[in-house]
């Protein structure tokens, strides 16, 4: 919206990313207190599970749905400073806001019906699947578009070629540090793979969001790193050497650095109010959306496997739930962990909430640095 102030969007990318960060940060810090007051007035408080750690009972009634502020800050800042003609900006916003809408409905039902579970798992997963599959199909063809091309042209070319299942080499799977190896996924394989990445990332961040500040700082760290990878993928001077020699140049991917900067600013502003003891929770409206945002950015930059490394905390949290649920079912009631997700296990082992959070932050910082080291090595 405001990028017309710059003669060349490409040349002003770093400045626009900084302005996006600053704009989102100011929006979050300025509007946070008013939002918290309004949520309290509406009695939009979190219903706490009674089977969890007893220290969490004091959190009952804490305002939730604060993730709406994160999404508003990201969206407004991105619309102000990003190149709105960029095809990748819109697909990331589509997933982010679409998953945010699912989360908003889920949170609203929890509050109105005083039910900690909200939407049924089947209903939530169904809507996540619709958005995830739509984004996956879009990305499969959008990655085939040459610089200056349009999505409609990609659809037309695909139709003229009688719907080939391998649209472009850009939809291969690339391994970090591999010099020239790329696994061809084909159109169907790519859509399924992207669907898993987006939906999996969304649910992983949502599962992690169980303690004050636990999910938001890792999201900021990983999102910022993905912004750097997106810049590398879209820059012809770096593409192909960013993390694997076979990795493609993705024209337009660099613009996601602006959105990633907005995410970082909005996330840090939210952390100001979400730090222990939290004044507000992000709720599913924030957690589902931010996870989907991370997954989609990773797909555009073609660093899905690096996302799994940098977001290791999200992966472990998800695996702990899967292991606990599976073992409980087949062992007739026995458990591997005292409670899942695993951050509750450590609480029940005697760790203070702040110890769990800060230690998980430290692990994420190390994993993010490890993920970025691949970029530095090349």
Language-model features: where?
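Juxtamembrane helix-capping/reentrant segments at transmembrane boundaries
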Residues: 49-62, 116-128, 343
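Juxtamembrane helix-loop transition segments at the membrane interface in multi-pass membrane proteins
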Residues: 42-44, 114, 285
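Membrane interface segments of multi-pass transport proteins and intramembrane proteases
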Residues: 110-120, 177-183, 352
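Membrane-interfacial loop-to-helix junctions in multi-pass inner-membrane proteins
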Residues: 85-93, 112-127
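A cross-family signal for N-terminal binding/gating loops and helix N-caps
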Residues: 40-45, 51-53, 57, 69
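Alpha-helical transmembrane segments
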Residues: 2-40, 70-103, 133-173, 190-378
């Amino acid at each position: 919206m405001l990028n017309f102030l710059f003669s060349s969007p490409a040349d002003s990318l770093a400045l626009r990313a900084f302005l996006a960060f600053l704009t989102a940060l100011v929006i979050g810090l300025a509007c946070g207190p008013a939002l918290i007051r309004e949520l309290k007035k509406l009695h939009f408080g979190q219903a706490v599970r009674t089977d969890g750690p007893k220290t969490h009972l004091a959190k009952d009634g804490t305002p939730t749905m604060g993730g709406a502020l994160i999404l508003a800050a990201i969206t407004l800042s991105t619309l102000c400073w990003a190149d709105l003609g960029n095809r990748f900006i819109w697909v990331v916003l589509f997933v982010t806001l679409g998953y945010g809408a699912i989360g908003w409905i889920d949170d609203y039902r929890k509050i109105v019906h005083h039910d900690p579970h909200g939407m049924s798992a089947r209903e939530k997963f169904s809507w996540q699947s619709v958005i995830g599959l739509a984004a996956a199909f879009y990305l499969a063809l959008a990655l085939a578009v040459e610089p200056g091309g349009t999505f409609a042209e990609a659809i037309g070319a695909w139709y003229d070629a009688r719907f080939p299942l391998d649209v472009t080499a850009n939809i291969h799977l690339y391994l970090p540090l591999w010099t020239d190896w790329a696994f061809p996924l084909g159109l169907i394989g790519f859509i399924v793979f992207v669907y898993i990445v987006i939906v999996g990332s969304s649910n992983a961040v949502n599962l992690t969001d169980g303690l004050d500040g636990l999910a938001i700082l890792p999201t900021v760290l990983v999102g910022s790193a993905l912004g750097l990878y997106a810049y590398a993928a879209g820059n012809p001077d770096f593409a192909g050497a960013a993390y694997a020699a076979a990795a493609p140049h993705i024209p337009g991917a660099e613009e996601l650095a602006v959105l990633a900067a907005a995410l970082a600013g909005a996330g840090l502003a939210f952390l100001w109010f979400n730090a222990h003891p939290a004044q507000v929770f992000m709720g599913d409206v924030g957690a589902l959306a931010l996870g989907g945002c991370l997954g989609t950015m990773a797909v555009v930059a073609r660093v899905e496997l690096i996302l799994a490394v940098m977001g290791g905390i999200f992966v472990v949290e998800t695996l702990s739930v899967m292991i606990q649920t599976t073992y409980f079912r087949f062992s007739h009631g026995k458990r591997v962990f005292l409670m899942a997700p695993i951050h509750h296990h450590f609480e029940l082992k005697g760790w203070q909430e702040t110890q769990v959070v800060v230690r998980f932050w430290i692990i994420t910082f190390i994993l993010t640095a490890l993920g970025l080291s691949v970029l530095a090595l090349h």
